[in-house]
Swiss-Prot record:
One GO CC term on file: nucleus
CDD domains: homeodomain
Molecular function terms, GO-annotated: DNA binding; DNA-binding transcription factor activity
Organism: Oryza sativa subsp. japonica (Rice)
Full protein name: Putative WUSCHEL-related homeobox 2
Region spans: Disordered: 1-25
Family: Belongs to the WUS homeobox family.
DNA-binding region: 23-87
Source species taxonomy: Eukaryota, Viridiplantae, Streptophyta, Embryophyta, Tracheophyta
Amino acid sequence: MAPAVQQQQSGGGGGSTGAAAVGSTTRWCPTPEQLMMLEEMYRGGLRTPNAAQIQQITAHLSTYGRIEGKNVFYWFQNHKARDRQKLRRRLCISHHLLSCAHYYHHHLAAAAAVVPPPQLLPPLHPSSSSSSCGGGLIDHANSLLSPTSATTPTSAAAAAAAAAYTTSYYYPFTAAAAPPPPRTSPAASPLFHYNQGGGGVVLPAAEAIGRSSSSSDYSLGKLVDNFGVALEETFPAQPQQPATTMAMTAVVDTTAVAAAAGGFCRPLKTLDLFPGGLKEEQHDVV
């Protein structure tokens, strides 16, 4: 029986040793005082304590709770790893932001280099057509108002019509035509109508007077043959003289004055020009 009791006692001692071993492997739960002191040492610059420092720290912190040397060693290792992860995360975020900013900056710079600024773009077609139309109208108005525009066909026709109204001879079949056109500028030289071969021609006053003085086409007989035109001087209207001082020298002058006063012209008859011609012919026949 003695050996059996010894075995039981030895078995009981082994069980107690196993229980102590299990209890010693429990996880370390630091107290707030221990954590505060460890963080103060870490902020002070201690990162990897040696064996002597670990024993001193363990002896100092054991007064606030259960702690071992390995607990102090692992705490410093884990704290450094957490700081490295935080730093790496911050570096990754900052690098990502910098890369995005660089990408957008490069993209915008390339777009600005490819696309020209708005002021360098050519004008649109509607604006160009409107500007060309406006310019054409302005040029046309300037050509009508300029003194040298009398040489163009349109301006020449307008000047001729104005001259026909103000300073020209009137024909019987065109006396009561359309309303008179506007007057031309005073700088334009006065024009004359004369009948040449049955058609009206507009000439300057000096040239018309020169032709009339040097050619026999403007004789009274020629004018009578060409529709019986009554001449009208192209000078400003003079104040009317008293009837007592006016001398009627020919029937042609009387007819011309009456036609000018009435506003129209009528064909001249042979009897008006030569009232005694018919009587002489009758006398010769008798």
